[in-house]
Amino acid sequence: AAKGRIVSYILDPAAEKRKLLLDASSKLGLPLLNMVDIQKKEVDNLGRLNLPNTMKEATLYEWLGNILHCEFFITDSFHGVCFALIFNKPFLCINNPMRGSGRFHSLLNLLRLQDRMLPEDAEALPENVPLTMDYAPVNELLEQKISQSREWLQQAFSGERDATLEEYSRLTEKKLTRRPPSRWGRLRKKGRKLLARAYHRIRRS
């Protein structure tokens, strides 16, 4: 049902985001299909977004499939942005300080996609937003960074590189002082495995 639609994934609904989605639908001439965070602490998200065609409980497969098959994607979720990049979908993201603006800026700056972020209080789509994105330079940058990271790890593991605390301080420090995984940590690990399995299943379909 996502084909030919703007799909949104909104973690923190607000009046401004609601107006933005309606404006995007009007300007791009596409119907909306909306998804929200459905954790128990966010049970009122449906009411706060207050838009038709909002899924009450999207399954993992539906969530991924909607992003994969949509015409355009709008989100205030960092992980939503990540999957838009993986699936090479045209997207806009709404700055979300509640969820950590730094990682949004870091990723988008790295890929030279700063223009894909809207301010937190944006109520309207910028003029002349294209329905497509040229992912060739984005994918090239991603491949470069992945290759550099893989090379760094291989050198660190083989002893060719001195993997000191100064070189990757926080990562090493956390590794050295890591405690046995908590129940929450085990659940997160299981969730990542389920997400990976769902992703590969969607890709094969």
Predicted regions and their residues:
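Active-site anion-handling motifs in enzyme catalytic cores
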Residues: 1-205
